[in-house]
Amino acid sequence: MEHIIIDGIEISNKGIERLEARTGLTILAEDSGELKNIVIKNMVIRDVNGSLVKSDGGGSAILIRKFGEKIKSRINGLQILNNHIYRTERNAINFRASANRDKWYPNLNVIVKNNLIEKVPGDGIVIFGCDGAIVEHNTLRDFPDILPDSEAAAGIWPFSSDNTIIQFNEVSGHKAKWDAQGYDSDWNSVGTIIQNNYSHDNYGGFVLVCNAGASYG
């Protein structure tokens, strides 16, 4: 799937009980090579009752998955714009990929912009397996205090991604039991820029910075 625009659709996915890995919208690049030009905009994604436990698969409003055991795979040109996301559990906009740098083939030209995220208890925007992603002009607020005591989460953060720019965002009211910062440059991420953002009323404060996980460097 490439050269596609998903525009102006309202999605909900609420079952009787919570279901691990439940999503509103999933984009999958797996053993598919390079997919180009995917736009997700003007959507309302709400009421996705996934698992509240990350290790169980969690749940997301928008999930971008990139894996390639046989063929290196990625998305080149992904825009997530002007969406309203609320009451999606565990997460809002979530990328997943391999963290193995021996097979590094990152998503490129990723823009996450002008999204409103409300009443999401876990991670707001997670950039994983990308190079040069821009996350800007997003508002994340009113994170409900419903995560289990074991769960860590934060507002906007890259994981195993390089040269991420996080700017002109507002994150407020994060209430996770662990972390709960507005912003984070997480594990195995190089060249992250966090600038001109607003953070307030988050249990963990403004920002968290992690190293490569195996050293103090």
Language-model region placement:
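Extracellular beta-strand/beta-solenoid scaffold signature
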Residues: 18-31, 53-72, 87-104, 119-127, ...
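Right-handed parallel beta-helix
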Residues: 2-13, 34-49, 72-91, 105-123, ...
